[in-house]
């Protein structure tokens, strides 16, 4: 990264290989005919390799140290069903009849569950301890509220361009944001009236 915060690099696209030259040296990325990355070589000579199935699902990632991450998918929709970290820890993922994520089980056997509405938006999240977080949305599908134990923890109101305009926190305090014609935030006002102006 340069003094101005920019990343300077030169890219060379070859047949099945892309070479990136930056301040650290030369990085090489090798691909199969379908565009799946097979191998990446770092400037220090270390190599990371990847395995894919015929459906272009990533099956395994081999680190330079020989550690392996594994990925398994369900047959119904080709969605990730199990992730095994290099240390052997496993995460399991299950889906409902619509193919939407319904629960996640971590390596300790704890399960988080999720329910979605008819639009496919998550409306209920339940922790392994049974604590439920509910989510509410606008007719346009934008998040409008987060509730826990029937108490609103966060409220969001949008302007006519669907930009978050007012955030109401758990204490009922409002935080306002104003935007430019290019949809960039230009002024933020806190509950005490203090404001911050942003320039782009």
PLM segments and residue spans:
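Extended charged/polar low-complexity repeat regions
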Residues: 1-200
């Amino acid at each position: 990264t340069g003094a101005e915060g920019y990343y300077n690099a030169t890219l060379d696209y070859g047949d099945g290989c892309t070479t990136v030259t930056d301040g650290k040296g030369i990085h090489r990325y090798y691909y199969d005919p379908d565009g799946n990355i097979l191998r990446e070589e770092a400037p220090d000579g270390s190599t990371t390799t990847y395995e894919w199935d015929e459906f272009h699902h990533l099956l395994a990632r081999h680190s330079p140290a020989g550690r392996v991450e594994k990925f398994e998918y369900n047959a119904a929709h080709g969605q990730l069903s199990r992730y095994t970290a290099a240390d052997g820890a496993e995460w399991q993922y299950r889906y409902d009849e619509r193919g939407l994520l319904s629960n996640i089980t971590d390596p300790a056997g704890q399960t988080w569950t999720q329910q979605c509405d008819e639009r496919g938006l998550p409306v209920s999240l339940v922790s392994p301890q049974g604590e439920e977080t509910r989510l509410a949305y606008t007719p346009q599908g934008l998040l409008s509220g987060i509730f826990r134990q029937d108490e609103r923890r966060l409220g969001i109101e949008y302007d006519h361009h669907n930009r978050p305009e007012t955030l109401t926190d758990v204490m009922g305090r409002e935080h306002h944001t104003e935007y430019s014609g290019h949809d960039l935030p230009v002024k933020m006002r806190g509950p005490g009236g203090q404001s911050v102006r942003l320039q782009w």
